Amino acid sequence: EGTEMGIVDRIKGILLEPKFAWTAIAAEPATTQSIYTGWVMILAAIGPLATLVGFADLGVAWSVRLAVGSYVIALVITFVLAMIVDVLAPSFGGRRDFVAALKLTAYSYTAAWLAGVANVLGTFGGLIVLLASIYAWYTFFLGAPVLRKCTADKAIPFTLIVVLCGIALGILGGMVLSGAGMGASTMRRAMM
């Protein structure tokens, strides 16, 4: 899968035929490193790179800090959310397997990470990313029974709890960025 065409095919599969894509993903051998280097580190960079363009008018130094901070936080949140998915799985009839949890988490983020290109639009891009995130949650829901082996009736509550955890992690990540001088007050000062 490490080829560029492999990535494009995988993206198309997750976005257009997620049920089939999850079956293929579940069957593939993978490691934490292979998932990060072959998927997460590539796709998670799209939004931060677009941020450099979309927020450049607020100052290059500020937009670089925001982009780098956002990228690091995306990498960390993906890992932490995968740990949460792994720990929660048995409570919903699933089984523990960190690599499967990371596959589910990382590949579910695909739509949201791709929508990160909308960050070139500045603040408006966030709305597009939000809409793509809703689709990402749906792909997680479809993948949960396949990768976590949870029963279909427990996939909805499992997905809802994971989504809430993901939102909480996103808020914490935003607070970290804000604490690092990249919050709304900094933006307002930069725009004046």
Regions inferred by a protein language model and the residue ranges of each:
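Selective recognition of hydrophobic, aromatic-rich stretches within alpha-helical transmembrane segments
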Residues: A61-V87, V99, K103-G166, G173
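Short, intrinsically disordered/low-complexity patches at protein termini
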Residues: G47, A56-V60, G122, A136, ...
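Short, hydrophobic-biased amphipathic alpha-helical segments
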Residues: I7-R10, I14, L160, L164, ...
